[in-house]
């Protein structure tokens, strides 16, 4: 198995941290843009997309800051990866900067980046930006 490599993407969002908290942290909010359905039991999030499902364990969540998970499949395979969405207000421009940190095998990175671009386009649509 090829080692997954970390990458980070940044996006400017014209929204408030309060709105972003709902969309990034709550199952209902995530279901509006990230997955078709999100079910949470204890610290395990089950994401449903196009008839498939993936599970991720919550590693960190903080209102006003963001959320971080590890895919259960990676955890079971002993692969130390995570995916994270964190945000801050730029002190100069006062816009919200969303940083997405994820991992992908080098051969898959371009496809994973395109998937994130599509997801963030959906997020922009939901927030009306």
Regions found by a protein language model. Give the residues of each.
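A generic structural signal for beta-strand entry/edge sites
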Residues: 4-6, 44, 64-66, 92-97
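Generic structural detector for well-ordered beta-strands
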Residues: 8-14, 46-48, 57, 86-88
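A short, structured loop/turn motif at beta-sheet edges
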Residues: 17-18, 59-64, 87-96
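Short, surface-exposed coil-to-beta transition loops
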Residues: 6-8, 52-56, 78-84
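Beta-strand/loop substructures that line and gate deep hydrophobic ligand-binding cavities in soluble
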Residues: 70-125
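Glycine-rich portal/gate segments that line the openings of hydrophobic small-molecule binding cavities
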Residues: 28-75
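Hydrophobic pocket/interface hotspot
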Residues: 20-21, 30, 45, 58, ...
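Hydrophobic ligand-binding cavity/cleft-lining segments
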Residues: 1-38
